[in-house]
Swiss-Prot record:
Protein name in the entry: Photosystem II reaction center protein Y
Biological source species: Cyanophora paradoxa
Residue stretches spanning the membrane: 5-23
GO cellular component assignments: cyanelle thylakoid membrane; photosystem II
GO molecular function, a single term: manganese ion binding
InterPro entries attached to this UniProt entry: PSII_PsbY
Family listed: Belongs to the PsbY family.
Function: Loosely associated component of the core of photosystem II (PSII), it is not always seen in crystals. PSII is a light-driven water plastoquinone oxidoreductase, using light energy to abstract electrons from H(2)O, generating a proton gradient subsequently used for ATP formation.
Membrane topology of the entry: Single-pass membrane protein
Keywords: Cyanelle, Membrane, Photosynthesis, Photosystem II, Plastid, Thylakoid, Transmembrane, Transmembrane helix
Compartments in which it is found: Plastid, Cyanelle thylakoid membrane
Stromal membrane side: 24-38
Length: 38
């Protein structure tokens, strides 16, 4: 594996994981809110 590939993929993977984490957190919050209302 080339160093350049690692340098490109690492921040990309971190950004992707952070986005997925935030979207999941928001989805759970929204689901809890609608669940408690109903």
């Amino acid at each position: 594996m080339s160093m350049r590939l690692v340098v490109v993929l690492l921040p990309l993977g971190i950004a992707l994981g952070w986005a997925v984490y935030n979207i999941g957190k928001l989805a759970i919050e929204q689901w809890r809110r609608t669940g408690s209302k109903v």
